[in-house]
């Protein structure tokens, strides 16, 4: 049995049998069975050699074990004439040749069962002593493959320690290399003392970009805090604290890290940015990603803020007003303003000549009447504005003139708002436009009964009151018509007159004789929120206080000059709900309040100019502690005492007045919430009537439409307020801010205009659903219920629009109050405004809260 033991070598089945030692074993096995062969009377028939066809469980491993062995071959094995085993192909094909009896042959289970069993035992022993099996080698292969994968991932994964997004070389755009020339730094506008900063000698090497706290802060803003993307590329603090100061604090092009030029940084959150020309300061430009208010810790006192909260170019200093100067490298052509460069291709020649005159006339009568203080106002057009969407008026580009060093330092002759209520005193003005008793209604596609339903709603909600629209000009036809959403066009035609919104008479900021008084101080645009519009502070005393503070502390000029539109942005609702119906729904509450206080304002129309928010001049300046602020008890018309001549005293007085105005705005907000609850009860009653008159499927369609209508109205109003905010900021930043901010505002405007196109499709879809619901209600409900339905749609839109506008006013007023408190040193967050006694906190409104 030693010959059947496992061998050290693995022989091929087709190899020679010279090393096999089965001679004696085969002879003994054959002799043991020879008796059976002899008894049969004939020679034993030869069977076919074992193969996979006859014995599929036999493979060549078995043959290797049976024919293999460690023992040396006998000397006469080479002379043996026994045939060698054939390959697998030969074993499977054809009959085998006859072999000489007595020689060892292939094993057969039927012929030699004992030898077959012994060979099986030898095979089992050989398998037990074999090296590692194939599964072990497969596991080793998997380990090697995993190691290779780890190496590949380590080479191609995102390097978080660098915090930089890299693009492949084939996709990376080539950035033009800037010459490493020394750029002299002029006096920084953010440092009124005029201290120059040392010039940097060369641009940073490509491999060393992004080192230091500046790049780390930038990466933190870009990747960790996307909401602070507005600060990338703009100044707003000391040197190396804000990114704009690292390159240039006053518009100077200078060396900057490589991250500023990296395209992936500018494309963060799908915000694609086109880089500015080489003669203008380069930097990252971003879009609005939510809140536009920057942290107060990064806003110095000498920086200005626009209406939307962005940091504007510094133009004020301790020595007075500093004109904006853009330095240009030697040999480079003096660049035009970015606003002119960007918009010149959108403007006709006539409007471009008006927007960019060669020299502003200083002695013309029209200029002297339009000019307030040192502010020059010229009309402008916005880029790529769809005429079929906005039938409003173009913004006014305010161009500041250098301050007059010989200007009088005394109290200025201010131009204040008229104390006449809205709708009174307009009959004496030329160019008055009066709408007849019944409003012209929009014709919506639908059934005849549906159109009659819209026209019949006038008798149920009280639209029969006459309305006076704002005249297109003053007695001298010098002041253009102001529209609250921020656009100016030519005088409207008769077909477009119903789309224009009424504006209060005092929004023009004229006194009783319609003649603006001369002033040598910078006038603040208040009231309508339009850039360059006349100030409409509640009283002359408050206006003089604001102008005096703006003269003493120019850093407060822009925060106090910002003002949202006095009327909700209803332009995007046109086509969904008739605007005349929406405005009429604002008027019933206006009539009730007007009977009580006819000389103040109309809250329902929501076109108040803060006149109603303050009591008499003596009462509005009174505080709880007269000893602490004794100056506030003095009448506004008299001169201020000596303690209040300081800047701090004036700021305290203005903060007290703004706090009172904020409390009154919260009171108005509670009134709107009560009105919203009343409309919700009307909707529930109407839904009960629809449940009784219509099928369950139609009732479900009506309920879904009313819920979707509130959401769509909120989105449209939010988009309209953002568009108006960006246009106001763009008009204010047209001439006195850096090009980076202007480009950012233009980009944001284009993004909002694309969203406006999407909103138009959504509005058309909801309008189709409204027409389908109205057709069902016309067949099922009586005329009175149809009027209630039409009034409900207009009332919901009116309440939502007023809530949106009131939120804008409260937020802006709170920002102004925070800015004054920061200057006073109160860095702690301001507490919630105190509410009048007997009032409770506002409850959850029945309408969904509008997005901010």
Curated annotation (Swiss-Prot):
Biased amino acid composition, Pro residues: 830-852
Modified residues (Phosphothreonine): 103
Modified residues annotated as N-acetylmethionine in this record: 1
Coiled coil: none
Organism name: Homo sapiens
Stretches assigned to the ASD2 domain: 543-825
Region (Disordered): 34-54, 81-109, 125-218, 276-320, 399-431, 464-496, 823-852
Gene Ontology MF annotations: actin filament binding; myosin II binding
Compositionally biased region (Polar residues): 279-289, 465-479
Residue ranges constituting the ASD1 domain according to the UniProt record: 145-233
Protein name from the UniProt record: Protein Shroom1
Basic and acidic residues composition-biased segments: 152-164
InterPro entries: ASD1_dom, ASD2_dom, Shroom_fam
Pfam families recorded: ASD1, ASD2
Subcellular location: Cytoplasm, Cytoskeleton
Chain intervals with Low complexity compositional bias: 125-144, 301-313
GO cellular component: adherens junction; apical junction complex; apical plasma membrane; cortical actin cytoskeleton; microtubule
Lineage top rank: taxon: Eukaryota
Keywords for this protein: Acetylation, Actin-binding, Cytoplasm, Cytoskeleton, Microtubule, Phosphoprotein
GO biological process: actin filament bundle assembly; cell morphogenesis
Family: Belongs to the shroom family.
Domain notes: The ASD1 domain mediates F-actin binding.
Aminoacyl-tRNA synthetase in keyword set: no
Function: May be involved in the assembly of microtubule arrays during cell elongation.
Modified residues (Phosphoserine): 18, 133, 137, 166, 190, 224
Subunit composition and interactions: Interacts with F-actin.
